[in-house]
Amino acid sequence: MLEVLPARGKDLTAAELLAVAADPIRWTLLNQLAADGSCVCKLQEHVPIAANLLSYHLKVLREAGLVTTSRRGRWIDYALAPAALDRLHAALPGAVTTAPVP
């Protein structure tokens, strides 16, 4: 049975959304998921980190609304959220105009 779990999709500012994606591990995960949805076991092949840390990064991406999940029995498959790239692209001008100047 396939059960789709909704993304939480917090209302993040442009800078917050880009900060979520800017983490090197999360960036790698987003790139991998953009190429092909995967289960955790396949994602772990691309990021050499402990399973609990991988789960944490996937949770952050899911809560930001950048990743969706679907359940297949005991397995959870991850995919790039349909609007993720559009949201990141739209966040760029906002982040540039609202970022504090050092």
What are these regions (language model features)?
Residues 12-50, 72-85:
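N-terminal helix-turn-helix DNA-binding core of bacterial DNA-binding proteins
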